[in-house]
Each structure stands twice: as structure tokens, then as C-alpha cells.
Amino acid sequence: MAETVAVRPAEGRDPGGFAYEDRPRLLEGLRAYGLIVAMWVRSTMAYRASFVMTTLGNLAATAFDFVTIVLMFTHVDALGGYTLPEIALLYGVSATAFGLADLLLGSMERLGRRVRDGTLDTLLVRPVPVLAQVAADRFALRRIGRITQGLAVLAYALFTLDIAWTPLKVAMLPLMVITGAAVFGAVFVSGAAFQFVAQDASQVQSAFTYGGATLLQYPPTIFAKDLVRGVTFVVPLAFVSWLPALYVLGRDYPLDLPRWVAFLTPVVALAFVSWLPALYVLLSLIHI
């Protein structure tokens, strides 16, 4: 059943109080998130030259990751049995999915600082979902540089790879980017919720977000199987790019999982995301 959310009356209505409407809490949070993001975008666009330069700087900084891989391939023909275009596919999917999550929810990593300095309390007294406020706080549009770079590498991979395309493989491409962004977003929120308890755990969170994105840019065959099991069954980062991308490439997964497991990516993303609001609220209540 939808929760009752207090909203301020529109112009021309009784200004003596609040009007109550039946509005789902989720929709109210999305609306608040959109309004806060729009405010930060307008603020960013007030200095367009600065925005362009910082975006280009962000793009250049992230591009060095792939340049490192290219330089590596000047000395070897394959890495873990994978060619440069195949690794470019893994890289492009991981970078694009992470870039989307970082753009939309990257501000969550600052929650620990808010808990420590007490500024989180100012968000708790506002009639807006706290999660929406924290996620949209200081929205950085310059992060589209990472997404642009990831899409460029992905385009290079698709152009150079010789893949026997089927309708399922074509459908898998946008699916793994979208669901991968959802999985990374869930990791961002999980790390932020953990900071209610740990308070100074931003580096731990970064190990799973930025570190996870870097991990997925390389083939799973170069890592120990225990690590591959961990990112498959414990923190399901493997469903971002490894499992679906290996299905597209027609390669077997190191853990000998059946290929249809790649199609569980949306299920895993939904399951991972669905319990996060409850976790966030629970740990915030512990903080209070």
C-alpha cells in the first residue's frame, strides 16, 4: 500500500497547512532526486568552460587505463588467453556500467563524512527521502567523461571482433550495461549504508566500487579461482561483465557454470537492489 506523503500546497490552495496525497515513497524519492540533480546541473552549466575542461580531464584520466592495456599488448599477443579486442569488450562494458552508476550514485561515498561532521542531521529533518538527498548531493555531470570513454572502447571492440551474432547476443549487449550499472549502484548504496556503522570506511567502499570496476576490465582467467568465486557468489560483480560478455564471446566461464547463467544478470541485479532500501533505513536507525 502506498505511504501517505506530505506535500506543500500548490499556489492558490489553502496556505494554512499541508495537503496530503497518496504518493508512493519510491516515486517521491525519484522526484526529489530529479529536482536536486537538476539544481546541480544548472549550477554546473553556469560555468560551461569549466565544465568542458573538467569533463575532458575526466575522460583523459580514465583513458589512461585502457592505454596501459594497449601498451601491455605491444609485448604480448594474449593475456590469459584473451586478445586485445576481447579484453576491450570486457573493459568497455565494465567502464560504461560503472560510469553510469558513478554518475547517478557516486555521491554516496561521501556519506561517511556527513555522519562524522554531523551534516547528515540537516537532511534527516527535511520532508524528503534521505537516500535521494544523499545520492543527488553535489551531482557531478563531468563524470560523463568516463561513460564516453567506456562507450568508445566498447565500440572499438564490437567493430574489431568477429562474433557470430544471434538475437540473444544482440539483446545481451544493452542488457549487461544496464544491469551492470544497477549492480554497481547497489554496491555504492551498500557501502554507504555500511558507513553508518564504520563511519570511516570510504576506502573499503572504493575497494569494491572502483576496485571492482578495474578487476572486471581484465579476463577472469588471470585471477585465482577463489577470487572468481567471491565476485560471482558473494559480491556478484561477475554478472556485470564477465558472465554476459563471455557468453557473447562464446567462451566458457572458469568455474564451469552453464552458459544460461549469463541470463540471470537481471535477476541478480534486481535481487541485489531490492533489499538495499531496507538495509539503508535499518542502519540509519542504528545511527540515530
Regions found by a protein language model. Name each.
Residues 142-201, 205, 254-264, 272-273, ...:
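Alpha-helical transmembrane segments and their short interhelical loops
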Residues 41-57:
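Membrane-interface helix starts
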Residues 87-152:
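Hydrophobic alpha-helical transmembrane segments of multi-pass membrane transport proteins
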Residues 151, 184, 188, 192-248:
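Transmembrane helix segments
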Residues 29-45:
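A short amphipathic helical element positioned immediately N-terminal to and/or at the very start
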Residues 59-95, 254-258:
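Transmembrane helix-boundary elements of multi-pass transport/secretion proteins
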Residues 71, 103, 107-114, 119, ...:
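Membrane-spanning helices that line or support transport/gating and their immediate boundary helices
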Residues 286-288:
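Conserved small/polar residues in nucleotide/adenosyl-binding loops
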